[in-house]
Amino acid sequence: FRSRCFEQIARLVKKIWQERLGGNKMIGIGSDHGGYALKQAVIKHLEEKGYAVKDYGCYSEESCDYPVYAKAVANAVKDGEVKQGILICGTGIGISITANKIKGIRAALCSDTFSAHATREHNDANILAMGARVVGEGLALDIVDTFLETEFSNDERHIRRINMIED
């Protein structure tokens, strides 16, 4: 009981601290074994930039099933536990397909910064998916920065199109 109370207090303090810093900068991240090493590099990069990161697994390079981690991150985004999500597997394909099964999730598989910028600006994507076997670490970090730093345009045409997806 006591440890649960401390955990709840810690979560509340963290939430208040984030709100005082200008909003929820909590990023949820998950990967399968194929994306584990890149995920570790992304976490380090994000923390150095001041983001709070919640790691939903996996926690080693031991073979595992990507849908478990895709669903965990997607549900955290959907429920507002984290602001945005990042998912990494070998190609980014399976993990993005899985995330997009969750209502309200717009996961975009990006292998370049142009796509990362466009999907945030036009589609208001809330999860970035990448393939660790497709992009190297340097490009991946550039993609992550572009995705997180690009705001949704709020143009009427983009809102209309997103609403058509949600219906």
Residue ranges of predicted features:
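N-terminal beta1-alpha1 ligand-phosphate binding loop
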Residues: 27-42
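Helix-adjacent hinge/juxtasegments
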Residues: 69-108
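A short beta-strand-loop structural module common to alpha/beta enzyme folds
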Residues: 52-63
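Short beta-strand segments
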Residues: 30, 87-92, 110-111, 129-131
